Amino acid sequence: MKRLSILAAGLLIGAAALQFSSVASGQGGGWVTLVDGTKMGDWTEVGKANWAMKDGALVADKITEGKDPSYLVSKNSYKDFQIKAEFWADDDANSGIFIRCDQSAKIDAKICYEVNIFDKRPDPTYGTGAIVDVAKVDPMPKAGGKWNTFEITAKGPHLVVIFNGQKTVDVQDSKHASGPLALQYGSGVMKWRKVQIKPL
């Protein structure tokens, strides 16, 4: 009996340690960490920029080949999910999180939903906090010069974007059902401190 009690206690301690380890590594509660501030993660790069880890963030500040934006595209596809992201943008940044892309070899707002980070977009209604050509923002919130958060939920046709605690998008749209996600670098300075996704 005593031996069984010791065994049971050992199993409980082991389970608790495993749970703590899972949470610490960002995999707890179903969340998968794609960027954690210490390593770039496993991406396919489409277009070239000087992506690098610096001071606890994934940073890009220059296109290194051609003129087109650069994208880090996830290896996995996602249908219904939540995303949590922490990022810093300068005033000139043109970036975004592209979701449910129809393919991974070419990324743009026509084949993905583009959750925008672009304070100086000529048409600000689809600037920072909007989904380009799907859901406008008015007034457009600003991301430049500070750390920001995105919480993005895609469940069926229902898309919700929360920027720095403020809901900027709550829309129904069914053009794109599933696919990889991508982080964009277009211009300015972009830093990604954390990106996590939780399949629903």
Task: Tell where the protein language model's regions lie, with residue ranges.
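Bacterial N-terminal signal peptides that target proteins for export
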Residues: 1-11, 17-18
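Carbohydrate-interacting regions of secretory-pathway proteins
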Residues: 22-200
